[in-house]
Amino acid sequence: MELFKSLETKTKNFNDPFQHFEINKPLTEETIKEISNAEIADPRNENLKYDGTRALDGGDGAFRSGIKDGGKAKKLRCYVTKENSNQFPNLTKLIEELRSEKVYKKIGSLIGKNLSNSYVRLEVICDREGFWLKPHCDIKEKLMSSIIFINLHNESKNLG
């Protein structure tokens, strides 16, 4: 349980510019390889301009409602689902770890929320240089968001 070990021993709390946490080394090397090998389109090859969202299809949420394939956004991210979990065995283990009582209680204590009736939605995203994300609340049911960055090429940690 790599994530839980990191939550217990490698977590820093920050209050500026808002309360957030930094968890160091929450993934195994195998999981990192699985993420870096995921087949996701590189947005630089799609001739798209970053607009502060991951939608990248020129429309807001209302524009995309009813588009079952997610529009262009779907091509630039990959959700780990029951149907494709065999392609992501290590990320599937991470989902199970996030669903474990020990982990969701630990995270809940950090953020001050009861996560006992929550769901995990894990996606692999190909954010590239120049990407930025507006603060947002995309669905009211969302209790928290977390982002784990994989930096295999020693890019600057000050990019965003």
Per-range role (PLM):
Residues 3, 9-106:
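Non-heme Fe(II)/2-oxoglutarate
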Residues 84-99, 103-160:
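Catalytic core of non-heme Fe(II) oxygenases with the double-stranded beta-helix
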Residues 1-7, 114-116:
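Short, motif-level signal for alpha-helix interfacial/capping segments enriched in acidic residues
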